[in-house]
A protein has these predicted regions:
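N-terminal core-entry segment
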Residues: 3-284, 327-329
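Short, surface-exposed alpha-helical recognition segments that flank or form part
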Residues: 125-126, 291, 295
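Intrinsically disordered, low-complexity Ser/Thr/Pro/Gly-rich interaction regions
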Residues: 294-339
Length: 339
């Protein structure tokens, strides 16, 4: 039942191994990614990547509008709207407008509240939430062409998913909700690109993003889970804005011995971040849910539908159901009293 997740890294790396022999710490990982994000040309985006990014965006809009009336969003709006700044950007599906940073937060919350959003199968990151929430808010504040918007979406997804690839599965196994912790980099990359950051400023934006990780898997089953992509969108956007005004940070935040990857995971694989930049695209690994729940339980739902159809079963004919699943299914979705 958890084959989609288990396939992420069948060739698991050794966990917690120190540098051995002639092994050297990685160098210029953060700079390489920053250089790529600021220099990648919109016109070089392959057509299949452009189409997948469009599908990702449309799927995200549907999720955000669909979740906009949920109690979670109502509560968040009630708490934070009185403290919002100028009415600069939309909260999709609602009449209220907020300042760009609060709008990014709210759209991130609403797009994830039903757990119906896109999934990067290699890492189980939900890529669009942090990135699209941030760049939509920015695009309402300053003019952005459709081509540049789509390119920024692709670059943001590339950044967050490549960074996620480098630390999965140990980062996730340690209890971090990777959509938030990696998503903040995607939001910083995408908004930074639209703000026209230099390579140096993008380096700083990544550093500022890295120092704001959110959230914890213990929050699954509560209103705080969708807060994670919302806060990632808001924090990544904030990082890019600060960097645009030369607010400095570490220039090696991904690869430093006390940097993001080494603190939040074990044995990170930095080649996942840098190899194939501009040649392979993580958005092509995106998937879209037929059911509004964690993907690990989808096979069980499919099985129930198949049995019902094959045997023409009705609910009153079923006394009980016994499922054999991977322990991860219970860990992620076995919430008997969701809040």
């Amino acid at each position: 039942a958890s084959s989609l997740v288990a396939s992420a890294k069948a060739d698991s790396k050794s966990v917690g191994a120190p540098l051995q022999g002639d092994a050297q710490p990685a160098k210029d990982v953060t700079r390489s990614l920053a250089r790529y994000v600021v220099s990648a040309r919109t016109e070089d985006l392959p057509e299949n990547v452009r189409k997948e990014a469009t599908r990702t965006m449309l799927n995200w809009v549907g999720c955000a509008v669909g979740g906009s009336g949920h109690e979670t969003v109502d509560n968040a709006m009630g708490a934070l709207a009185p403290f919002s700044g100028p009415a600069q950007a939309s909260v999709l599906g609602r009449s209220e407008r907020m300042d760009v940073l609060h709008a990014a937060l709210m759209n991130g919350i609403s797009s994830h509240v039903f757990d119906f959003d896109d999934t990067h199968l290699k890492t189980v990151i939900h890529p669009a939430g942090p990135v699209a929430s941030a760049i939509l808010a920015l695009a309402e504040y300053q003019p952005v062409s459709g081509r540049d918007f789509l390119n920024a979406l692709v670059l943001g997804i590339e950044a967050e998913c490549r960074i996620g690839n480098a630390v999965y599965p140990t980062h996730y196994d340690m209890g971090w909700h990777i959509t938030g912790t990696a998503g903040v980099f995607g939001a910083a990359a995408a908004t930074g690109r639209l703000l026209g950051l230099t390579e140096q400023q993008m380096l700083w934006a990544f550093g500022l993003a890295a120092t704001q990780p959110v959230g914890l898997k213990v929050m699954f089953g509560t209103m705080t889970k969708p807060f994670h992509p919302g806060r990632a969108a808001q924090s990544g956007f904030t990082a890019a804005l600060l960097a645009s005004h030369d607010y400095t940070s570490s220039e090696e935040v991904l690869e430093a011995s006390n940097g993001w990857a080494n603190v939040l995971s074990r044995d990170p694989d930095y080649s996942e971040i840098t190899e194939g930049l501009g040649e392979t695209y993580e958005v092509l690994l995106n998937a879209y849910k037929p059911f509004a729940c964690g993907i690990v339980i989808h096979p069980a739902i499919d099985g129930c539908i198949q049995l019902r159809n094959e045997h023409e079963l009705t609910a009153d004919q079923i006394e009980g159901i016994e499922l054999q699943v991977h322990p991860l299914v219970l860990q992620l979705t076995g919430k008997k009293t969701p809040q």
